[in-house]
């Protein structure tokens, strides 16, 4: 599933249109549609979308030793996977 497919799925589950999501994050509907179509959302936009949808956005860095750092829209955590 692509990022844009997931965003559309979350919107559908919450009965939120892409136009409404765009309004919530301060973008035009046309601009958000283009970014979803091209898969060109920035990390900051992903955080804004997560906040607007009431979900957590996170990314992870896993070090060679198994130590994992997860960045969420509310901060960073360290998960020791050893």
Please give the residue ranges for each predicted region:
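DNA major-groove recognition helix of helix-turn-helix/homeodomain DNA-binding modules
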Residues: 44-58
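A short, Lys/Arg-rich alpha-helix, primarily the initiator
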Residues: 1-14, 20
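Short, charged recognition helix plus adjacent turn
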Residues: 60-82
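Alpha-helical residues within the helix-turn-helix
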Residues: 12, 23, 51
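Recognition helix of helix-turn-helix/homeodomain-like DNA-binding domains
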Residues: 26-41
């Amino acid at each position: 599933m692509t990022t844009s497919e997931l965003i559309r799925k979350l919107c559908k589950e919450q009965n939120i249109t892409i136009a409404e999501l765009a309004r919530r994050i301060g973008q035009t509907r046309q601009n958000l549609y283009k970014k979803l179509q091209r898969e060109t959302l920035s990390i900051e936009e992903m955080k804004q979308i997560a906040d607007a949808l009431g979900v957590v956005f996170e990314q992870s860095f896993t070090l060679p030793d198994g130590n994992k750092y997860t960045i969420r829209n509310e901060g960073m955590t360290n998960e020791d996977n050893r």
